[in-house]
A protein has these predicted regions:
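Acidic-basic catalytic patches of nuclease active cores, encompassing PD-(D/E)XK
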Residues: 1-27
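Short, conserved glycine- and acidic-residue-centered signature motifs
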Residues: 6, 10, 63-68
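Catalytic phosphate/metal-binding cores of nucleic-acid and nucleotide-processing enzymes, i.e., regions
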Residues: 18, 61, 78-80
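Active-site metal-binding core of divalent-cation-utilizing nuclease and nuclease-like domains
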Residues: 23-43, 98
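A generic structural signal for short beta-strands and their flanking turns/coil linkers
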Residues: 32-34, 47, 86-88
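Conserved catalytic cores of phosphodiester-cleaving nucleases, focusing on short active-site segments
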Residues: 36-59, 71
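Short, well-ordered amphipathic alpha-helical segments that serve as non-catalytic structural scaffolds
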Residues: 74-75
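Domain-level recognition of nuclease-like catalytic cores that cleave nucleotide substrates
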Residues: 82, 86-108
Length: 108
């Protein structure tokens, strides 16, 4: 996915989350292990969000076990370097031209 399309999908996802009552804490958090697209908080739960965009197939298929391992390592790094004492979950935000869908608490 091009950088422009990826940024637009993340912008849409961030706006959607804010409308749903989430506070956006960070976007594009990088570590040597990988990147978290959006880190948000709602009701004292941290949400580590992976945003996927697709025009012609189900975007969830692009979250592989390898990608999940990178996300988990990056989350662990984030939690070590930031003072948060709350529960967390990994969410997928699937963006298509017609829809935004959140799949909460994903695993692989």
């Amino acid at each position: 996915m091009s950088l422009k399309i990826g940024n637009e999908a993340e912008d849409k996802a961030s706006s959607y989350l804010q409308k749903e009552g989430y506070a956006i804490l960070e976007r594009n958090f990088h570590s040597k292990f990988g990147e978290i697209d959006i880190i948000a908080k709602k009701e004292n739960i941290l949400h580590f969000c992976e945003v996927k965009f697709s025009q012609n197939y189900d975007p969830i298929t692009r979250i592989t076990s390898s990608k999940m391992n990178k996300i988990i390592k990056t989350i662990n790094y984030y939690l070590l370097t930031h003072a948060h004492s709350c529960d967390y979950q990994i969410d997928a935000i699937l963006v298509t031209p017609e829809n935004i869908e959140i799949i909460k608490n994903i695993s692989y």
